[in-house]
């Protein structure tokens, strides 16, 4: 199973690009357009995941899923959250689920 520490690195990249707004930065451009645009892009990526699940191979599904998670990370950052907040929630749910068995 892959380790998830690299998610911290991606989170820091998102924060840095949001703060410094370098030229030619996709993250900076998306963040500058605001939450509605970030949300729209996340929705588009979600649709692409569904399409890949229904009509594409596994590699394409994994690729589109990575895009979805990346854009989710940008959205979470725009709400002063990060992916580790989601991981913690999943961990809490897992503890509840496993304690019931």
Q: What is each PLM-predicted segment?
A:
Residues 1-65, 69-101:
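Flexible "arm" and connector segments at domain edges
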């Amino acid at each position: 199973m892959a380790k998830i520490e690299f998610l911290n690195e991606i989170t820091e990249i998102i924060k840095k690009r949001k703060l410094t707004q370098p030229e030619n930065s996709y993250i900076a451009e998306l963040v500058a357009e605001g939450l509605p645009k970030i949300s729209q892009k996340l929705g588009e990526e979600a649709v692409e995941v569904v399409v890949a699940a229904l009509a594409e191979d596994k590699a394409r599904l994994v690729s589109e899923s990575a895009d979805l998670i990346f854009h989710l990370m940008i959205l979470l950052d725009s709400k002063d959250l990060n992916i580790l907040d989601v991981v913690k929630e999943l961990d809490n749910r897992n503890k509840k689920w496993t304690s019931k068995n």
